[in-house]
A protein has these predicted regions:
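A structural signal for isolated positions on well-ordered beta-strands in alpha/beta enzyme cores
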Residues: 42, 69, 133-135, 290
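Metal-dependent amide/peptide-bond hydrolase catalytic core
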Residues: 1, 171-175, 182, 188-382
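Acidic/histidine-rich catalytic neighborhood of metal-dependent amide-processing enzymes
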Residues: 107-183
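Catalytic metal-binding/acid-base residues of hydrolase active sites
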Residues: 19, 75, 141, 171, ...
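Glycine/serine-rich anion-binding loops at beta->alpha junctions
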Residues: 97-113, 200
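Acidic/His- and Gly-rich active-site-bordering loop/insert found
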Residues: 2-99, 123-128
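Residue-level recognition of beta-strand->loop/alpha-helix junctions
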Residues: 45, 136, 293-295
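Short beta-strand segments
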Residues: 71-73, 135-137, 165-169, 193-195, ...
Length: 382
């Protein structure tokens, strides 16, 4: 049965300690599997420093169009506190309906379903009217500078064209199949340093306390009403994530205070426009400050195409519920892929991602396999 193949493949993938940005042999293993099934495999390593070196795999079966691509990342976040796990995080454990292991949800489970669905499809239809491909990286959970982005640039220079991508990020909220992502919010990180004047707490008139201004500015920032959301996006949101003064001395007013905050923004904005709004709010306060920002992603949303409608129908047929077309969640490699290919993000439930005792359900793996397999039938059978 297919689920047994999925579990066998997933067990092997989980056994690789592929903590970002290291493949630890996992992509090489996948390449061998796919090569044996007739895929042409291309492995590229990007990054100059040892700690940057990232393994990327592009595998393709066939030369025709459309090219249906299973995209994803084999890297996982560290398990941390392994002593708090009930089982070895890098050894798949099946207990009843639950399947435990680091990456089962995010996102080795989806990769296993994609691999098995492709191999089983090709056993029945060895000459599809199109191509099947895989685009996999070991650098998504980290900086993502040496993974999917440069691999896509490399493939474009070679003339490779991907027509439709399925990115197996965990998307389900309450039930399998309840959400399909066709876009993502943008993200921009800020570091604000407010400069005061150090002094003795007993003589505050000789000092300028930066904390006083920092608290007022933080309040104003959190009260910014950026927008009311848009058709596919929720309201833009700002969260203060750190407030530091670096002062452990009880009788000193510190020299400076540092605020760090993140803004997740919709398609009304860009990172630059968000910076302008933030700067305007801070500038209303009479303080000396330094403001730096860095964006990891701009927002994007794609046109809801015919292929996306067909994919939605496949999901609904499997789950028996109409999926929500969504753009929420964290950043993903879809921010790179959508520039080269139509893309949907669809995978398992995100509520277990990055958690201790990360796990998924056997029934969800079976359902995901069915969706992926039926997608190949839909898009590649004339």
């Amino acid at each position: 049965m297919a689920i047994e193949q999925v579990l066998e493949t997933l067990a092997k993938l989980v056994s690789f300690r592929s903590v970002t940005p290291y493949s630890s042999g996992s992509l090489e293993y996948i390449a061998k599997l796919l090569t044996n099934a007739g895929f042409s495999c291309d492995i590229q390593v990007f990054g100059e420093k040892e700690e940057e070196k990232t393994t990327n795999l592009y595998a393709r079966y066939g030369n025709g169009s459309p090219n249906i691509c299973f995209a994803g990342h084999i890297d996982v976040v560290p398990p941390l506190n392994e002593n708090l796990w009930d089982y070895n995080p890098f050894e798949l454990k099946v207990i009843g309906e639950k399947v435990y292991g680091r990456g089962t949800v995010d996102m080795k489970g989806a990769i296993a379903c994609g691999i098995v669905s492709a191999l089983n499809y090709l056993k029945i239809y060895p000459s599809p009217s199109g191509s099947i491909s895989f685009l996999l990286t070991s650098d998504e959970e980290g900086c993502a500078k040496f993974g999917t982005k440069p691999m896509l640039e490399y493939l474009a220079k070679k003339g490779e064209k991907i027509d439709f991508s399925i990115l197996g990020e965990p998307t389900a909220r309450a039930h399998f199949g309840d959400t399909i992502a066709i876009g993502r919010r943008g993200s921009v990180n800020f570091v604000l340093k407010i400069i005061g004047k150090q002094g003795h707490v007993a003589y505050p008139h000789t000092a300028i306390n930066p904390i006083t201004s920092a608290v007022k500015i933080a309040t104003d920032l959190m009260n910014i009403d950026f927008d009311n959301g848009s058709e596919f996006f929720e309201k833009t949101n700002l969260e203060v994530i750190s407030f530091d003064v670096g002062n452990n001395v009880v009788n000193i007013i510190p020299e400076q205070a540092t605020l760090k905050f993140n803004v997740r923004f919709n398609d009304f904005h860009s990172a630059k426009s968000i910076f302008g709004i933030v700067l305007e709010v801070i500038s209303k306060h009479e303080v000396i400050f330094d403001l730096q920002y860095e964006s990891s992603a701009e927002s994007f949303v794609q046109k809801y195409s015919e292929k996306m409608k067909k994919f939605t129908a496949i999901v609904q047929n499997q789950s028996q519920i109409p999926p929500k077309i969504d753009t929420n969640g964290g950043t993903s490699d879809a921010r790179f892929i959508h520039k080269y290919s139509e893309i949907v993000e669809f995978g398992l439930s995100f509520d277990q991602a990055h958690k201790i005792n990360e796990h998924t359900q056997i029934s969800d793996l079976q359902s995901l396999y069915n969706v992926y397999y039926n997608s190949l039938v839909e898009f590649l059978q004339k």
